[in-house]
Every structure is written in structure tokens, then in C-alpha cells.
């Protein structure tokens, strides 16, 4: 429920921001068709699949009824871009994805022959600064008074930033030495540096609105908290695909 609420809140904030930008643009008499665009706002939604390659994830999938695919989640995000050159943008980006999955131990039950149950959740919120390079011209200047956008504008990009992550397991667990069942919460959260590469295309739907499709891969890891003592760094990397809308200004 908390993950769904946070996703909805982030989507609402991004949508409201773009709505304000669109309203302000409608009141501006200097339409971009008379000049090349100076930037853009965008919102998107899609699916994020963490790599889940570190030993903490392997321990989880080996012992609990969770598969690597269960760490995938709906992804929502947005960005604001500033044009540096005709084919180069500086982009500030934020996104969020999170999952929560109930599970039980695969090979053990409690003294009453009941499953030993717990819930695993994993949330990621990267904030990055990127350079986005367009593989073709985004449009062309006609005379001194008009700039006409091209129908499709493919691009690639790369960036760096920081990711806030939260990995939690809450419920009943087994003591390795005594086989006793006990309730507990194990949690690791914090900030970690990340890098990413991306590629996509913008498909113009009007003079300043467009459909945007994108794929990205984020790379990063974090040292686990003392709750997960003995494990190596937590893998924060993953692949995401998305589609959304953007507004040029």
C-alpha cells in the first residue's frame, strides 16, 4: 500500500508540473515554431527489472518462495531538459520503482507444520544528471521566422547521480543454529552513486507535444546495513523500458 501511494504521489506531482508548464506555454506568444526549442518537460511510465545479481538476492530466491522476476516493478518518472546545442541536451531526471512480495521458506515449516511467512520489499529512486545526444537534427529552420520539428528524433545518452534504495524483509525467520522461528525485520536503506546509459526516440504528435519511448540501464551498488552482515554489496543495477509524453518549450 505504501509503495502504491508513493508511486501515485510521484505521478501526480510530475503530471501537475507538466500541466503548469503547458499552461504557461499557452500564454506565451513567442511559440517555438518561430525559434528552435530551448528545453522540454516529460513524464513516463514503464517497467523496471533489477538485475538482482548480488548474494543477498540469491540467498532470498534460494530460501524463500521469491523468484528474480518478482523484483520487477512498475516504474514512473519524469525529467526536465535544457538545450545546450542543436543536438545536445542537459537532462535532470527522477524515477521510482518498488515491489513488495509475500513469501515463505521453501524447505521449512514451524512446529505446527505451518508455513514460515515474511514479506520482502525493494524500492529504488534514482536522481541523475544526463547528457542526451540526438542522432539526427530535431528540426530545421525555415527562413528567419519558423522552426519545423522533424517527425522522429532518435537519441542516446549517459549520466551519473545518486539512488535512494530501501531493501526490507519483515516477518518470521529461522535461526540457523537452533532452527528456532523468530519474528524480526531486516532492513538496508540509504544513498548510493549510480551511472546510467539510455536510448530512445521522440515521435512528434503536434507542434510541441510528442510521444517518447526509452530504454535505460542503471549501474550501481551499495554496502548493506548491519542487519545483513556477511553479505556483499547490494546490486542496485537494472534495466527499464518506458513510454510517455513530453512538451517542448
Where are these regions (language model features)?
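Cleavable N-terminal export/targeting peptides
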Residues: 1-37
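Short glycine/proline- and aromatic-enriched beta-strand/turn motifs that initiate or cap beta-hairpins
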Residues: 24-82, 165-167, 242-249
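Gram-negative (and chloroplast) outer-membrane scaffold detector with strong preference
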Residues: 27-30, 81-174, 239-249
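Extracellular loop and loop/strand-boundary signature of outer-membrane beta-barrel proteins
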Residues: 29, 61-67, 112-121, 143, ...
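Strand-connecting loop/turn motifs
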Residues: 36-40, 47, 83-87, 149-153, ...
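Residues that define the transmembrane beta-barrel architecture of outer-membrane proteins
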Residues: 37-39, 70-76, 121-127, 152, ...
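Transmembrane beta-barrel strands of outer-membrane/channel proteins
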Residues: 43-49, 92-96, 156-162, 201, ...
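Predominantly the C-terminal beta-signal and adjacent terminal strand-loop region
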Residues: 99-103, 115, 197, 203-249
Amino acid at each position: 500500500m505504501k509503495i502504491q501511494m508513493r508511486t501515485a504521489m510521484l505521478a501526480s506531482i510530475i503530471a501537475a508540473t507538466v500541466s503548469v508548464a503547458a499552461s504557461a506555454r499557452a500564454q506565451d506568444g513567442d511559440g517555438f515554431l518561430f525559434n528552435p526549442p530551448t528545453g522540454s518537460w516529460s513524464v513516463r511510465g514503464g517497467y523496471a527489472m533489477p538485475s538482482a545479481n548480488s548474494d543477498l538476492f540469491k540467498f532470498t530466491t534460494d530460501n524463500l518462495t521469491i523468484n528474480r522476476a518478482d523484483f520487477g516493478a512498475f516504474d514512473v518518472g519524469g525529467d526536465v531538459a535544457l538545450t545546450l546545442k542543436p543536438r545536445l541536451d542537459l537532462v535532470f531526471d527522477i524515477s521510482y520503482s518498488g515491489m513488495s512480495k509475500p513469501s515463505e521458506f521453501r524447505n521449512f515449516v514451524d512446529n505446527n507444520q505451518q508455513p514460515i511467512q515474511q514479506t520482502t520489499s525493494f524500492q529504488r529512486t534514482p536522481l541523475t544528471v544526463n547528457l542526451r545526444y540526438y542522432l539526427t537534427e530535431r528540426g530545421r529552420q525555415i527562413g528567419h521566422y519558423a522552426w519545423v520539428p522533424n517527425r522522429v528524433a532518435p537519441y542516446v545518452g549517459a549520466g551519473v547521480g545518486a539512488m535512494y534504495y530501501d531493501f526490507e524483509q519483515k516477518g518470521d525467520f529461522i535461526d540457523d543454529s537452533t532452527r528456532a522461528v523468530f519474528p524480526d525485520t531486516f532492513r538496508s536503506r540509504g544513498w548510493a552513486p549510480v551511472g546510467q546509459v539510455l536510448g530512445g526516440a521522440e515521435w512528434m504528435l503536434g507542434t510541441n507535444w510528442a510521444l517518447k519511448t526509452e530504454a535505460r540501464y542503471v549501474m550501481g551498488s551499495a554496502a548493506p546495513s548491519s542487519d545483513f552482515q556477511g553479505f556483499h554489496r547490494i546490486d542496485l543495477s537494472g534495466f527499464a523500458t518506458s513510454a510517455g509524453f513530453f512538451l517542448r518549450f
